[in-house]
């Protein structure tokens, strides 16, 4: 193997080790990290917005509806895929957005991400959690 190929393999290995693994189960948070960092980004990554949400010991943070967002997560037992939906009509316009929740909820680590066809579909699927 050439020196260039060896160096490239070493860089890829280092990057793979640095990228967090997305676990299907939640695990306890052992460090001082608290709350969730919620983001919504455009499908082409031309824009992103984010906000911190803390649910323990009480809803707080700059999220505009921290109480509603925490209540929605509590009802879903911390699983954004199980949020109670807020159905309302949406256009079929394809303008994808990706929602992400990273951090901790009630002491459990979370790294969740999902792409929706547009902002309206995101809103119907996630209710107050990503309304910021």
Segments predicted by a language model, with ranges:
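N- and C-terminal low-complexity/disordered segments
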Residues: 1-98, 102, 108-132
């Amino acid at each position: 193997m050439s020196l260039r190929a060896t160096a490239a393999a070493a860089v890829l290995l280092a990057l793979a080790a640095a990228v967090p693994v997305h676990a299907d189960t939640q695990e306890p948070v052992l460090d001082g990290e608290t709350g969730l960092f919620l983001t919504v980004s455009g499908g082409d990554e031309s824009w992103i917005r984010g906000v911190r949400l803390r649910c323990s010991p009480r809803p707080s943070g700059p999220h505009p509806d921290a109480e509603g967002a925490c209540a929605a997560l509590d009802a879903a037992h911390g699983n954004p895929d199980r949020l109670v939906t807020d159905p309302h009509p949406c256009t079929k316009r394809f303008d994808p957005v990706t929602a992400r929740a990273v951090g901790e909820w009630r002491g459990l680590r979370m790294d969740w991400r999902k792409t929706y066809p547009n902002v309206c579909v995101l809103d119907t699927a996630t209710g107050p959690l990503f309304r910021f």
